[in-house]
Every structure is written in structure tokens, then in C-alpha cells.
Swiss-Prot record:
The modification N6-(pyridoxal phosphate)lysine is found at residue 351. It holds the Pfam family Thr_synth_N. It comes from the Eukaryota. This is Threonine synthase-like 1. SUPFAM superfamilies: P-loop containing nucleoside triphosphate hydrolases, Tryptophan synthase beta subunit-like PLP-dependent enzymes. The modification N6-acetyllysine is found at residue 281.
Length: 743
């Protein structure tokens, strides 16, 4: 058996020691166990010394032409450790012939077996190992390597690989047969690389080997530093004594808890990760799934969700359940306006882009010994999206995770209500509340902060409460992807070059969607202005113009765009916290004042800072219907009422000096009566499915949403509960549902 030891004393790169992990004993008693066990395994498998590698190996993986050998030598020099090239140092010495001769001698399938056997008979410690391009295709040998090192995937753009292989005059690699192009083979190989890596280095076009080597070392440092990426409450007050430990949460804890114990919302303690211009350019030709994997890996530490597992979740979330293979395509409407279509998911709204992924994240993060009840308040679209998303979990997860969604009984469209009711499954229920969305949302926050009630549920039923509204970081984060992807699509389609600015116009109620666009800008997307579009419930427009958030004498109006019929915009707190340099004391004062006095005023300096990036206006009901009518008549495209609100505002305030991406947040068929009124179609008092067929007969763009049509057929057989607008009544419903599901 081959065995390599460290050639010399390793250079110490870090001296970070671990402190013990303490498990809280309050109402969130067991929420940390899942990550604690993961960290224990990570530390046990990696930290044999305080140096960067210790006795473990750095294993470089990637396709032929990725630069594994060259980069490995540079890293070996930097760390002063042994460098092993599997081709030269293992295979050829074992076989006494060149790799190409062996491949020609035994053929593709037998070559993989022979290669795997050679690797299984090899061991090393404290070394840099450069794999062959085909090593990851042999499971047993990869498990053998993985248990004694960290695998770093050198992810090189496909066109760069093909160019390099031509220069290297390599035209035969394992698996390539006559009639198989190099491009197709390299694409096929990706599935194996994605299966094994612990950390990915995204190699932008033109990056030098030295730059890639530095990225590898940084990726390993991040992989080791399991305590570096934490979350704090927006109401967290930084201690004056810098030596005092900051109360922070890991990503998995933030997802599980949903709302901070002090009533604030979780946000990253540090800055958002930023991609370089070259990295963004390398994503221009990528698919939505590939973009999501790169971006979310940067935002979620592998100790919370291993990169390969996260990739599996993303592929599951954005698969055949979306009617469009592009997931969130961008369509040119007219002039400088583009429509970002966010309604191709199973429930026809932008909420699907988060809620097809978030349940898988949640199920991964929670410990296996606890039950969880997800409480959701919906203004229309969230309810059905949450119920649909959590219904797609596997059988075991559905037995320990249940959902109840509260919606305003008379505050959503008839179709939305039908859709929410029709989305009920064995682990999800809908409850109508005789009030508005703001009551539903506030009630859920109060339930979370009722420690007596939540503690009782934990002790009596072994059940912990959590949320899937956009107050939950795991729900908000995936929305960043589609804003970034929309910009990349404009570059890909040739409308702009990378670096050119764009504006985004977003129909806004709870501030989550537009906040995700802010985070996309922080990651490097050049968004110039965020245009906040309100309907008659224009509290956000007034706030952006004046800095005064005033709910006094303001009553919620029911409009054609019910999903933004919101007065208390929860995610605004996150943005104000960001603008105020993470001043938790200020957030506590402002939002306590909002709760007690129903208004607050921010200082002039914050108003000016807000207005540097934000523009806002509102749209009347008549203007909304007129926009739907005129857009259809000029382009054959039907806007839903929320998108129409955004278009009216974009037409009014955008200066047309750069493209504006209008977020289309729902499919028009969810609001058939309003659409028929706008198009001056004589409204018929028939079923929702009949209305959809009627609209479908117009052959407009976008086409009829088949999943919505199927859902309307199901709901007519479903029942649901209605309750009074009373906190105690809602709590009683929650307890009864827990009894039915988990006892």
C-alpha cells in the first residue's frame, strides 16, 4: 500500500481553538442539537492540530483542465507540505505504464475499476492531493479519500475547460466515445463532482493558478471556521465591553426559531458575501439551479448544510414542479421595461421560489427528536405556497413537521381562498380569521413571544413553534437568487453588458421581496434604484417619502391586489437595521413605539440615506385596471393586479435612462374576476375553473397556468375552519391541531 506522510513541519495558518457549545435550556431547548452534532463530526474529522491541514489532506477535485495539478503544487509550496498527483504518483507507479496507455488497454469501464483499486490501496496524511478527473466516478475510493481530508471542487466555466483541453491537445478522456462531444462529456461529469465536494472554488474566467490557490485556502479556512457566520436580532444591543460574548445564532438556529426572542428579526452579524465581477460574468451562461447553488453556498455555512446536500435540495426544489425550465424567466415587455416572471411554480406566485426550497432547509436543520408546528400568516399567496411546499417533504419529515396557515377570511381573493383551502394535506391546515392580515401576522408574533404558551407546548406535547413567513431568514434568503438571476438573464440576452445599472420595481407590502433585491445588490448586482410600488394601502410609499411610519387613522383597504394589502411591513425592520449600522437599540425604540403609539419617525440622515436608493409611489384601483387593459391591448400580455400596480408606478417614476425589471409576483389567473373586469369581459358567476378556461381562450401571454387549474378542481371538495379575531381562540386552534397531528 502506498502511504505518504507530511514531508515537513506545516506552516500554521490559524490558531483558532474551539470553545464548548452550550445548549440552551429555555423554550428552544433542543433546537441547537442538530448543528451541534454536525459541528462535532466536522471538528472530529478535521481538527487534529491547530494548523490549516494538520494530519488531514487537502483534496483537489475537478474535470480535466481545471488546473488541479498546478494549483496543488502552489498550495504545497505555501503550506510546506507534500503534493501528490494521483495520475503521476499513484496510477502510473502502480501500473508501470502511462494513464493513456492503460485507458487504451482496458477501456472505459475497466479503467474506472482499476483506478479505484489503486486509490483504495493508497493513503496519505497532511498532503495536497490532486485527483484525476475520473476519480469521483468511483464511490468506494472517494469515500476512502473523503474520510481523511476535505475535498475542494475547482469549478471552472465550461468554455474555459474546452479551450484549455484544446491547448493541451487532450481529446481522449475516460467516458468519451465516438460521437460524444467534449462539451457533453464535461456536462455529464458534473453530477459526480457535485456529489463529493466539501467546499467549492468558483474559478472565474482568466483567473491565474495563484489566484485559484488563494481561493482554495480561503475556502478551507471558511470550512474550518464553523463559528464565523452567525446571526443576530435586529434588536440586539451590542455590548460596550468588546470582550463580552455577543449572543448570536447560527443559520440553522435562525431558521428553526424564525423570530428572535426579543421580538426582532434575524440578520447576518457580518456583511453579505460579495462575488467578484469575474465570478458574476461566469454565471451569465449558467442555469437558475446553478446560480442558486453558487449564491446560496456563499450564504449558508457547510456546517449548517453541507454544500452537496444543499445542491440536492436546490435541484429538488426547482425541478418538474415549475412549469418553465428557466424557473424565473425575464421577458421584454416594451421599451425599457422587462417582466420578471415569478409565477411558474406550483401555486402561481413568487412565494414558490422560496417555499419549494425552505421546507427542505428547515427539515434538515431541526433535530430528529422534536416535532415542529409551523405558524403562517398569509395575505393571499403565502398560505398555499407554504402548504404546498411542506406537503412535498418525505414521509418521515411530514410526520414531525406540520403547518397551520391563518388567512383573513374576507381579505383574500376568492381564488386565493380556494387555493389555500385546496392546498390542505395530511400535515397542513388552513384557518380563516375574521380580521385582516395585520391581525394574523401580529397574532403569530405574539404567540411566538408568549413563553408560557410555547413552553407549555414543548413540555406537554414535545412540539416547538416556528414560522415560514418572510420574517424567517430561511424563507427570505432564496429570494435573493431570482433578483440576481434576472440581471444575469438581461446580460445573457444581450440587452445590457455586465456592470450596466438597472432599476427594479416591485409591488411591496411586507418589504421582503424588495429587501431581497437589496441583498442582491450587496452581493454585487448593479441595481441603481429600488422602486417600491404600493396600492391604496400606501404606508410604505408615505414612509419612504417622509420617514414617518404612521398607522394612526389608517384603515386597511381591500383592493384588487390583496397580497400587498398590508400596513405593518415586518421586513422593513431588517432594512432600517442595515441603514442604521445595526443599531439594535434604535430598532427596539422605533418598533416598540409603533406597537404602543402606532407610528414612528426616523431621523433626517436616515431618510436621506433611504432616498438615495429608494423611490416610491402608489397606484389607485382604477389605474390598476387600466394598466391591465392597456398592456393587453398593446402587447397581448396580461398582468396580474400586483404587477399592474408595479407597472403604473414604474411608468410614473422611472426615468427611462436604464432598464427596469418589474417583478411579476403572481399569475393573472389567481385574480380572474379583476382581470375580466379590466378587460371588460362580462363577468359570469361560475366556478373558478370556468373563469380560468374563459381567460385561457384569449390565448394571451403568459399562457394558462395548468397547476392552478387543477387546484381549483380539488378545493371544491375541501373543508376548513374559521375562527374569531381573538388571540386565545388562535392559540386554542394551534393546540388542538398539535394534539391531532402529534399525539
Amino acid at each position: 500500500m502506498f502511504h505518504f506522510n507530511r514531508c515537513q513541519h506545516l506552516k500554521k495558518i490559524t490558531q483558532k481553538c474551539f470553545s464548548s457549545i452550550h445548549v440552551k435550556t429555555d423554550k428552544h431547548a433542543q433546537q441547537f442539537l442538530s448543528r451541534t452534532f454536525a459541528l462535532a463530526e466536522l471538528r472530529k474529522s478535521w481538527y487534529s492540530t491547530h494548523s490549516l491541514v494538520g494530519d488531514k489532506n487537502i483534496i483537489l477535485m475537478g474535470p480535466p483542465g481545471a488546473g488541479k495539478t498546478t494549483v496543488g503544487r502552489i498550495i504545497g509550496q505555501k503550506l510546506g507540505c507534500c503534493v501528490i498527483d494521483v495520475d503521476d504518483d499513484i496510477l502510473e507507479k502502480t501500473w508501470n505504464m502511462s494513464v493513456s496507455e492503460k485507458l487504451q488497454d482496458v477501456g472505459n469501464e475497466q479503467f474506472l475499476e482499476e483506478e479505484g483499486k489503486a486509490v483504495l490501496n493508497f493513503s496519505a496524511s497532511g498532503s495536497v492531493i490532486s485527483l484525476t478527473g475520473s476519480n469521483p466516478m468511483h464511490d468506494a475510493s472517494m469515500w476512502h479519500l473523503k474520510k481523511n481530508g476535505v475535498i475542494v471542487y475547482l469549478d471552472v466555466p465550461l468554455l474555459d475547460l474546452i479551450h484549455r483541453l484544446k491547448l493541451m491537445k487532450i481529446d481522449r478522456i475516460v467516458g468519451r466515445n465516438s460521437g460524444t462531444s467534449m462539451k457533453d462529456l464535461l456536462k455529464f461529469r458534473r453530477q459526480y463532482y457535485k456529489k463529493w465536494y466539501d467546499a467549492r472554488v468558483f474559478c472565474e474566467s482568466g483567473a491565474s493558478p495563484e489566484e485559484v490557490a488563494d481561493k482554495v485556502l480561503n475556502a478551507i479556512k471558511r470550512y474550518q471556521d464553523v463559528d464565523s457566520e452567525t446571526f443576530i436580532s435586529t434588536r440586539h444591543v451590542w455590548p460596550k465591553d468588546c470582550e463580552q460574548k455577543v449572543s448570536a445564532k447560527f443559520f440553522s438556529e435562525a431558521v428553526i426559531e424564525g423570530l428572535a426572542s426579543d421580538g426582532g428579526l434575524f440578520v447576518p452579524a457580518k456583511e453579505f458575501p460579495k462575488l467578484s465581477c469575474g465570478e458574476w460574468k461566469s454565471l451569465v451562461g449558467a442555469t437558475y439551479i446553478e446560480r442558486a447553488q453558487i449564491l446560496l453556498e456563499r450564504c449558508i455555512h457547510p456546517a449548517d448544510i453541507p454544500a452537496a446536500r444543499l445542491g440536492e435540495m436546490i435541484e429538488t426544489a426547482y425541478g418538474e414542479n415549475f412549469a418553465c425550465s428557466k424557473i424565473a424567466p425575464v421577458r421584454h415587455l416594451s421599451g425599457n421595461q422587462f417582466i420578471l416572471e415569478l409565477f411558474h411554480g406550483p401555486t402561481g406566485s413568487f412565494k414558490d421560489l422560496s417555499l419549494q426550497l425552505m421546507p427542505h432547509i428547515f427539515a434538515h436543520c431541526i433535530p430528529p427528536s422534536c416535532n415542529y408546528m409551523i405558524l403562517v400568516a398569509t395575505s393571499g399567496d403565502t398560505g398555499s405556497a407554504v402548504l404546498n411546499g411542506f406537503s412535498r417533504l418525505n414521509k418521515n419529515d411530514k410526520q414531525r413537521i406540520a403547518v397551520v396557515t391563518f388567512f383573513p377570511e374576507n381579505g383574500v381573493s376568492d381564488f386565493q381562498k380556494a387555493q389555500i383551502i385546496g392546498s390542505q394535506r395530511e400535515n397542513g391546515w388552513a384557518v380563516g380569521v375574521e380580521s385582516d392580515f395585520d391581525f394574523c401576522q401580529t397574532a403569530i408574533k405574539r404567540i411566538f413571544n408568549d413563553s408560557d404558551f410555547t413552553g407549555f407546548l414543548t413540555v406537554e406535547y414535545g412540539t416547538i413553534l416556528s414560522s415560514a413567513n418572510s420574517i424567517n431568514w430561511g424563507r427570505l434568503l432564496p429570494q435573493v437568487v431570482y433578483h440576481a438571476s434576472a440581471y444575469l438573464d438581461l446580460v445573457s440576452q444581450g440587452f445590457i453588458s455586465f456592470g450596466s445599472p438597472v432599476d427594479v420595481c416591485i409591488p411591496t407590502g411586507n418589504f421582503g421581496n424588495i429587501l431581497a433585491a437589496v441583498y442582491a445588490k450587496m452581493m454585487g448586482i448593479p441595481i441603481r434604484k429600488f422602486i417600491c410600488a404600493s396600492n391604496q394601502n400606501r404606508v410604505l410609499t408615505d414612509f419612504i417619502k417622509t420617514g414617518h411610519y404612521d398607522l394612526r387613522e389608517r384603515k386597511l383597504a381591500q383592493t384588487f391586489s390583496p397580497s400587498i394589502d398590508i400596513l405593518k411591513s415586518s421586513n422593513l425592520e431588517r432594512h432600517l437595521h442595515l441603514m442604521a449600522n445595526k443599531d439594535g437599540q434604535l430598532m427596539t425604540e422605533l418598533f416598540n413605539q409603533l406597537e404602543s403609539q402606532h407610528h414612528f419617525q426616523i431621523e433626517k440622515v436616515l431618510v436621506e440615506k433611504l432616498q438615495q436608493d429608494f423611490v416610491a409611489d402608489w397606484c389607485s384601483e382604477g389605474e390598476c385596471l387600466a394598466a391591465i387593459n392597456s398592456t393587453y391591448n398593446t402587447s397581448g400580455y396580461i398582468l396580474d393586479p400586483h404587477t399592474a400596480v408595479a407597472k403604473v408606478v414604474a411608468d410614473r417614476v422611472q426615468d427611462k435612462t436604464c432598464p427596469v425589471i418589474v417583478s411579476s409576483t403572481a399569475h393573472y389567473s389567481k385574480f380572474a374576476p379583476a382581470i375580466m373586469q379590466a378587460l371588460k369581459i362580462k363577468e359570469i358567476n361560475e366556478t373558478s375553473s370556468s373563469q380560468l378556461y374563459l381567460l385561457g381562450s384569449y390565448n394571451a401571454l403568459p399562457p394558462l397556468h395548468e397547476a392552478l387549474l387543477e387546484r381549483t378542481k380539488q378545493q371544491e371538495k375541501m373543508e376548513y375552519q374559521v375562527c374569531a379575531a381573538d388571540m386565545n381562540v388562535l392559540k386554542s386552534h394551534v393546540e388542538k391541531l398539535i394534539q391531532n397531528q402529534f399525539i
